[in-house]
């Protein structure tokens, strides 16, 4: 039964994809303006991703070293474990926890 449902779902999905692609191809042939805008936006995305890749290739290690410093104090290098302006609330094991009682 599970195989039947799976094959029906795949058949429907492939049918929808085929209908969409044929409709897209027909629309592509009929509309030069949409095709030009699509090509322009696709080129812009490819150019942007290429620029991001090149920038990360040259500046990536610098950015990475800023956020992941090696050394004492955890992830950010010299950062203390507890900030100085906040008190550390410590409790000993002999101290009972306060509970709400009605």
Swiss-Prot record:
Keyword Transmembrane helix applies: yes
User: What GO cellular component term, any one, is given?
Assistant: membrane
Tell me the domain of life: Eukaryota
Membrane-traversing stretches? 36-56
Q: Which InterPro entries match?
A: TCTA (IPR016560)
> What membrane topology does this protein have?
Single-pass membrane protein
Any idea which UniProt keywords this protein has?
Answer: Membrane, Transmembrane, Transmembrane helix
The places in or outside the cell where this protein is found are: Membrane
Which Pfam families does the UniProt record give?
A: T_cell_tran_alt
Task: Cite the PANTHER family for this sequence.
Answer: T-CELL LEUKEMIA TRANSLOCATION-ALTERED GENE PROTEIN
Q: Which family does it belong to?
A: Belongs to the TCTA family.
Q: In its UniProt entry, what is this protein called?
A: T-cell leukemia translocation-altered gene protein homolog
Lineage of the species this protein comes from? Eukaryota, Metazoa, Chordata, Craniata, Vertebrata
């Amino acid at each position: 039964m599970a195989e039947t449902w799976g094959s029906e779902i795949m058949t429907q999905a492939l049918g929808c994809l085929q209908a969409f692609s044929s409709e897209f191809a027909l629309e592509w042939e009929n509309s030069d303006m949409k095709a030009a805008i699509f090509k322009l936006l696709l080129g812009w995305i490819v150019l942007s991703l290429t620029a991001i890749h090149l920038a990360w290739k040259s500046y990536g290690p610098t950015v990475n070293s800023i956020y992941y410093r090696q050394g004492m104090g955890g992830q950010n290098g010299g950062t203390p474990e507890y900030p100085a302006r906040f008190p550390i609330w410590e409790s000993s094991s002999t101290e009972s926890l306060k509970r709400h009682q009605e």
